[in-house]
Swiss-Prot record:
The lineage of its organism: Eukaryota, Metazoa, Chordata, Craniata, Vertebrata. This is Leucine-rich repeat-containing G-protein coupled receptor 5. LRR repeats lie at residues 44-64, 65-88, 89-112, 114-136, 137-160, 162-184, 186-208, 209-232, 233-256, 257-279, 281-303, 304-327, 328-350, 351-375, 377-396, 397-420, 422-444, 564-585. Belongs to the G-protein coupled receptor 1 family. GO terms for molecular function: protein-hormone receptor activity; transmembrane signaling receptor activity. Glycans are attached at N63, N77, N208. The gene is Lgr5. PROSITE patterns: G_PROTEIN_RECEP_F1_2 (PS50262), LRR (PS51450). It comes from the Eukaryota. SUPFAM superfamilies: Family A G protein-coupled receptor-like, L domain-like. It comes from Rattus norvegicus (Rat). InterPro entries: GPCR_Rhodpsn, GPCR_Rhodpsn_7TM, Gphrmn_rcpt_fam, Leu-rich_rpt, Leu-rich_rpt_typical-subtyp, LRR_dom_sf, LRRNT.
Amino acid sequence: MDTSRVRMLLSLLALLQLVAAGSPPRPDTMPRGCPSYCHCELDGRMLLRVDCSDLGLSELPSNLSVFTSYLDLSMNNISQLPASLLHRLRFLEELRLAGNALTHIPKGAFAGLHSLKVLMLQNNQLRQVPEEALQNLRSLQSLRLDANHISYVPPSCFSGLHSLRHLWLDDNALTDVPVQAFRSLSALQAMTLALNKIHHIADHAFGNLSSLVVLHLHNNRIHSLGKKCFDGLHSLETLDLNYNNLDEFPTAIKTLSNLKELGFHSNNIRSIPERAFVGNPSLITIHFYDNPIQFVGISAFQHLPELRTLTLNGASQITEFPDLTGTATLESLTLTGAKISSLPQTVCDQLPNLQVLDLSYNLLEDLPSLSGCQKLQKIDLRHNEIYEIKGGTFQQLFNLRSLNLARNKIAIIHPNAFSTLPSLIKLDLSSNLLSSFPVTGLHGLTHLKLTGNRALQSLIPSANFPELKIIEMPYAYQCCAFGGCENVYKIPNQWNKDDSSSVDDLRKKDAGLFQVQDERDLEDFLLDFEEDLKVLHSVQCSPPPGPFKPCEHLFGSWLIRIGVWTTAVLALSCNALVAFTVFRTPLYISSIKLLIGVIAVVDILMGVSSAILAVVDTFTFGSFAQHGAWWEGGIGCQIVGFLSIFASESSVFLLTLAALERGFSVKCSSKFEMKAPLSSLKAIILLCVLLALTIATVPLLGGSEYNASPLCLPLPFGEPSTTGYMVALVLLNSLCFLIMTIAYTRLYCSLEKGELENLWDCSMVKHTALLLFTNCILYCPVAFLSFSSLLNLTFISPEVIKFILLVIVPLPACLNPLLYIVFNPHFKEDMGSLGKQTRFWTRAKHPSLLSINSDDVEKRSCDSTQALVSFTHASIAYDLPSDSGSSPAYPMTESCHLSSVAFVPCL
């Protein structure tokens, strides 16, 4: 019986049933034969679409209309299909049973469904293809059996499916290709066997599938292919062998003369032989990246006149550029992750139609002229070894729109290298060795990246880039030329505190300003408004300038400027005076005065660092952007940062040592015990200095945080390493202050309990306590700033942060000597002794005066000797040297003063 007679018979039967059942359903009433729990709608005048999906059904509805053309029973709990239950649905064209619990489909389950075209059985529990249930569905065009547990396909299960076009068998448990079952599918056009467990494809596996156009075999375990496994696939255009275990190039593809798209990436293929695609002249696209390819035949890609795209990523052993003779239509070439060191001079002769060239992550050192590739639109050469861009390399590439030369070693670019690129809009030269940048011919650029070129410190005029929208520069100061000055950051606060507000909101706000600005000319006000809008729409330049990357002034405010100058002058002058009075004679210095003198020396270094910053601010006043990159990246900034951290940490460590020394000294004097020798103290001082030196060196070794800003200090925000460094310093210094506080608390508690009846050097104990209190108070803002940064607290304004870093941090170096000069009587005594010594040496130049004073000096020496003898333990309490026989002029003068000093309690 032919097809026309079958159709006539079906139409006659349908007409008879229609007459028996009455008139067809009306649109305004519930269609007859629609289950109450399903959703139904008319499909034309007579047919019905029934949707019973996701209702938790455990069996098929029994009262379905014979005119049902579409039935969706997916996402239910149906586990059985009774035989002949659906045989009445002669007009059914699409049946969906996906997402159920079917484990078996009996013979006759689909009997009578002569109009069925689409059958969906995916996401069930089938372990094999139904052996007889699918037979003789002559109208079936699409069959989905994917996402089951099918491991067996009976040889005759697809018998009679002469109209089947699409077959899904992916995501199952097949271990081989069911050759016998496919022999009856001569009309099949697309089939997927992906996501199975197939290990091998035998010869003639698809021998009778002459109409097959698309074949997916990806994500299997295929490790070998029969040399004739693809024989008979005369119409195949797409072959997907990706994500398998192939060890050898699939030479079986040579019989696929109509193949257009081939993919075998993510395998274990190590070589591509010569003339590998000689039998595939219709190839348009090849994907075989992510293979450990070590060898590619020079002629592997020759004579592929239809090839449009060639992608080969990760072929790490390729050292030569392939010969592409006869592949003149290639439009996109990607050869990344290889070891190609040079390009042939004839590359553009072979590829005149090339539009995209990606040779990134190679070892290219030199580039030939690419002027013959007139159609090039995109070139990607990042991560190579290119040193120089010559004048003729990119000449006359009128269609080139994107050029990526990032992460090379480019140090030289010819002034006219980009002069004939009128269509170029994106240029990436980041992370190179550029010290200059040619701007000729780049008027059309919209995106420019120059970040990472630390030697490129000069400003680039914005007038050369009228179309620029996004630019990335090595230094924030270079963004000042593109409207990125500090006043730009004030505009959002002036006009709108909400960043999401629109320009219309700005205009509404301006409308209210006219009433309060009667004295201003309307035209001038509108002009100012338009200028502000231009600023708001300025070029997006990064890194943006700001308070810590200023365009005009290093210090910003006059308060900071005056504070830095005052701190620097006082720190240098006062510490120099203290150090001079302490170290004016090298013969003998008491332990506490030695510590005060060393603290004064390191505080001088802090004054030097502040003075250098003040001088830089003065010389760059109003034009810091022109010198900011030079200063920030230079050795001077590193020296300033190193001196600042070294001086700050040394001062804290030495102050801690002074507090401990005072406590230990008081303990020894109260018990008349011998103190530790001065050499031990000097060794500890040296250890403190070495520790501070190590701490100050860490930023130089760990990425040079000193160059992070023109302030030359590790900022307590930004990079995690810098924040961690600052927090570690705060914790270490806090520990030092805690130790000092505990030591002095114990000392004063002992004094209150009367454990010490007398204390000789009361002034030094009080002075050290004053230093401790002052330094601790001044360190609190620094500690708070560091911890607030760690906790991402952003309520502290940048000006306050700059004030803390530039004024508060070096302030102890200024106050320490002032406290000693103003409040400590030892300074007055030292100055008096210095005056006496000066007069003594002045008289020594005159013999008459010397003879007159010799008797007086001798008398004083005797008096001082008597004083020393009367106090048997004076050498212990006074920190006198063990050798008291020496009697130089100055020490004897100072020792004479000791006879008049009595032991008094320090209360």
